[in-house]
Amino acid sequence: MSITLSELPFIDLYVRLDQPDQALYRSKERGKSHINQLVPPEYQLAVDRFMSAVNEGLKENNDGSIDFEGVRCRLSKQKMSDNSSWVCARRINTVIPDMDKLGFAKHIADHMKALGKRDGLILVSGATGHGKTTTAVGLLAYFLRNYGGAAVTIEDPVEFMLKGRHGEGGHCFQVEVRQEEDWAVCLKRALRWAPRYIYVGEIRTPKAAEQLLRAATTGHLVITTVHAGSPEEALMGLIFLAEQAMGPGVQNILAAGLTGLIYQTMKETGPHIKYLFTEPDSPGDPIRSLIRENKIGMMSTYIDRIAARLANPSG
């Protein structure tokens, strides 16, 4: 039996599409994730089959997903300066993340798990490739398993197979946004299902940001991921996007709706977390006040205080 791509330990796979060329990959093996390596020659036939499948699947599109020989990938195609065409295939793990096995300090993981009892908005932020989606999905799966209720996810593409039963009382419905659809329309439609939890893979439009904030302040617990270089940047980016649809006053809505913010950096030893949360039923919470007063840049002080408080709850 010929070797398949499922045996290559890749996170990202780079394959030329217009003609055969040397493929490269970024390994998921510890200590090797920061370098690109040449795909070994014994995988060439598998790479050739993958190239054909991607060309057939994407056609004129630049983004999409593929199930290929036991591997599910998110695809992003680019035309290069020399007119060559390449695709980056991000491997999608079909195993649902377990919050107890993601490498978080126990006191932080336990507090994040408890957020599932609340409503509001949980932002999971960080740079590309630092595990935002894994953490967000791990939280949602934990909430469903332990607290029950219905969840609707809105993704492009679906990255983990969450659909179906979770524990005794949890059920997840997964929606993959079609290319011609708007994220805001899918989110608005999801609200009619009266879900306990909503997971939005990424906020891409002002209207979607508006719907997300509306959902977070009307009894749902909403989880989403945000590309950002810092916790403050994550909040300011969401405000900037939502203001284009909602106008002034977004800070007040975000302040009322924010439940938790996770900023994640993946290191060789595991995830490094900056974490903040608001107190329930506390309009005077200092985090909410900073957001309302547009003083988000001062939030780092509270992140440090929260870290110390969780690490030493009796101190």
Question: What residues fall within each predicted segment?
Answer:
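Short, flexible helix-loop junctions that flank or precede catalytic/ligand sites
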Residues: M1-G315
